[in-house]
Structures are given as structure tokens and as C-alpha cells.
């Protein structure tokens, strides 16, 4: 469910924000977690157990690190949590690539894993969130989060799930624990304005520029080999600008949504 899709703009976002604003401050995190899990499941419920498992591992690792004295056991917990978390990312993103490489180099006949054709939603972003959190608890930069709901919201909140940004736990902890005054009219206005500007960058600029480079160097277009030098450069520049405005637009929409929620 992309931020610029009709389903998100006219169904999910209004309902999610409306419910979030209506509930008391003490249950906002629980509501946001449910909304984030629904958003995640829209991209593929198959991967929900993996995401929940990764969150649980690092939540438990944080509590263990907080309870253990300085010494080798803490380092073992840190390494185990990081290895398990990173292994999930590597498995999902690179297993089929490695199988293809082996088939080419060693003439093996390994079949690709079809269920890995669609990656878990946001796995790169929440993997690095989890690793940064556990490392910060280990080094004493942050205290271990005791609330599983607050921790899960930090990792899986839907505004940051698709394209980040990767925000450190210490930069969000105070807001996530704030039960009164989190949402204000000014934040809602500023966030909505930021979201609209990001949406414009994505829909008006990025998508329009994408159509240009597709006509020149994309599949079904003129083709880079057949294009003149100026036209080829135009296609390359258009592709670069499309990537920039696509990422900038999504990032701005993400930040706008987060600001609207406090």
C-alpha cells in the first residue's frame, strides 16, 4: 500500500488518523501498533511472524543487556541478537541472488525460492532500527525499553515502514512515552502540509519524469543503444531526477505523517 495509492489516501490514512486522534493518550501507542500491523499485512501477511520474531528477539536482548553485569555474557547477547537479525535480512534479500550465481558459476540446478520474490515490507529499515537499538543499549546510550508495545511501535510504525527514515530509538523515546499533549493542531497542520508537498513531488514530478526516461531508455522505449547522445543524456538525467524526487517525496510524506501523529 503506497502512500500515493487511492486506498491509502482515501481509506487507510483518514481512518487511521481519525481513530488515533480520538483515543486517549494512554492507548495511542496500542492503536498505532494495530494500525501498523494492518498496514504491514496489506503488503503480505506471510512475513508478519518474521517481523514479530525479529522485534521479540531484540526486545528480549535489550532487557537481558540491561540486567546483566558488564562482561562477556553481554557481548554474547549483543552478537547473537545482531547475527539473528542480520541473518533474516540476508536470507530474504540475497538467497535467490546466491542461488542464481551458483547456477551460473557452477552450473548447478538450484531452483529459486518463489516466496522470496516479494520481500517483507520494510525489512531493510526495521532491521537497521533493531540493530541500532540493541547496540545502543549495549553501549549504554539508551535504557532498555520495558514496554513491548512502545518498542514494537518504534520498530514497525507504518509512516516509516516503506522507505524510512531510519530513526534511532533515543530520538523517539520521549515522544513514544508522552501520553498528554502529543498531538497538537499545529503539528497536524505542519504535518499535513509536509505530506502534501511530498505527495506532489512523488505524483507530479517523479512520476512525470519517470514517463520521460521510460520513453527514451526504458523497456519499450527508443533504447539507449539507438538514442542520440543528447537524447541518451536526457534519459539518464531524467532517471536520476526521478529517483531523487521519488525518494524525497516518500521521505517527506513519511515525516509529515509522523508529525501529524505527534
Q: In which residue ranges do the predicted regions lie?
A:
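Membrane-embedded transmembrane alpha-helical bundles that form the catalytic cores
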Residues: 1-262
Amino acid at each position: 500500500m503506497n502512500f500515493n495509492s487511492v486506498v491509502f489516501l482515501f481509506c487507510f490514512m483518514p481512518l487511521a488518523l481519525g481513530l488515533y486522534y480520538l483515543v486517549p493518550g494512554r492507548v495511542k501507542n496500542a492503536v498505532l501498533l494495530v494500525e501498523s500491523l494492518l498496514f504491514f499485512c496489506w503488503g503480505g501477511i506471510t512475513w508478519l511472524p518474521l517481523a514479530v520474531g525479529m522485534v521479540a528477539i531484540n526486545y528480549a536482548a535489550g532487557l537481558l543487556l540491561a540486567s546483566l553485569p558488564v562482561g562477556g555474557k553481554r557481548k554474547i547477547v549483543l552478537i547473537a541478537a545482531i547475527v539473528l537479525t542480520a541473518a533474516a535480512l540476508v536470507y530474504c534479500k540475497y538467497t535467490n541472488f546466491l542461488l542464481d550465481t551458483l547456477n551460473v558459476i557452477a552450473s548447478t540446478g538450484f531452483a529459486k525460492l518463489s516466496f522470496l520474490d516479494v520481500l517483507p515490507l520494510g525489512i531493510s529499515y526495521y532491521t537497521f532500527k533493531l540493530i541500532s537499538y540493541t547496540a545502543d543499549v549495549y553501549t549504554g546510550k539508551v535504557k532498555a525499553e520495558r514496554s513491548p508495545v512502545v518498542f514494537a511501535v518504534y520498530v514497525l510504525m507504518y509512516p516509516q515502514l516503506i522507505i524510512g527514515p531510519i530513526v534511532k530509538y533515543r530520538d523517539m523515546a520521549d515522544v513514544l512515552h508522552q501520553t498528554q499533549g502529543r498531538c497538537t493542531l499545529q503539528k497536524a497542520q505542519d504535518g499535513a502540509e509536509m505530506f502534501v508537498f511530498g505527495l506532489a513531488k512523488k505524483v507530479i514530478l517523479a512520476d512525470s519524469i519517470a514517463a520521460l526516461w521510460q520513453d527514451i531508455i526504458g523497456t519499450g522505449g527508443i533504447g539507449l543503444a539507438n538514442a542520440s547522445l543528447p537524447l541518451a543524456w536526457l534519459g539518464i538525467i531524467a532517471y536520476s531526477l526521478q529517483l531523487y524526487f521519488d525518494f524525497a517525496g516518500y521521505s517527506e510524506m513519511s515525516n509529515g505523517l509522523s508529525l501529524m501523529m505527534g
